């Protein structure tokens, strides 16, 4: 019976999300950026673009062409 508890605990640890990797939040922010006609930039927006939001918790920026 102890082996079942140990296996369950190990399975739980491996399936737990990594801290700082907000998978669902990142996906929603990325989708919202695409809906607003933007793109996700890794470092920053290009000179002819403006920042309209963020694409992830880690700091990617959502950019689109200036109007």
UniProtKB/Swiss-Prot annotation:
Segment forming the signal sequence: 1-22
Location within or outside the cell: Secreted
Coiled-coil annotated spans: none
Swiss-Prot/TrEMBL GO biological process terms: cell chemotaxis; defense response to bacterium
Keywords in alphabetical order: Antibiotic, Antimicrobial, Defensin, Disulfide bond, Secreted, Signal
SS bonds (residue pairs): 33-62, 40-55, 45-63
GO molecular function: CCR6 chemokine receptor binding; chemoattractant activity
First-listed, main subcellular location of the protein, grouped into a coarse class: secreted
A single cellular component GO annotation: extracellular space
SUPFAM superfamilies on file: Defensin-like
Any Pfam family hit: Defensin_beta
Keyword Amino-acid biosynthesis: no
Function statement: Exhibits antimicrobial activity against Gram-positive and Gram-negative bacteria.
PANTHER family from the UniProt entry: BETA-DEFENSIN, BETA-DEFENSIN 103
The family this protein is said to belong to: Belongs to the beta-defensin family.
Protein name: Beta-defensin 103A
